[in-house]
Amino acid sequence: MNDVRLADFRAESLQFDMNHHFQPKENENLQLSIKLDQRVRMSSTPKEPVFLNIRVTVFDNAEVNNYPFEIIADVTGVFFIEAEGSDREAVLRDNGMVMLLPYVRAMISQLVSLANLPTPVILPPLDPSQMQPVEPEQAQ
């Protein structure tokens, strides 16, 4: 049985950058541009916590792509996993992401709200299978 428990999470970095050169196009409904990256850090000891870092970027390269702003939310979750061997990383990538994403979505919505923009940004539920792979790091 594979059991995953989210013990804690923290925002490593929350960045909001307004694009003051943004030129809205008339009658255009701007679609959200979302990029997801993840990194896993774990020890070889099964009882030790494992760490899943998620970086969500909304409107990447805002000035170049003519987006109104850019948000980067970098969040790390601390998990305990009941699984054996190499299955631990696969279990974390599949289940940990699903557990952590609602918190990341809320953080991003709050950033936009605090920026006092006229239109709220609420991210849709995100699909972990759309992730862009990042080289995993091994814990010391």
Q: How would you label these PLM feature ranges?
A:
Residues 1-98, 106-140:
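N-terminal intrinsically disordered, cationic/polar leader segments
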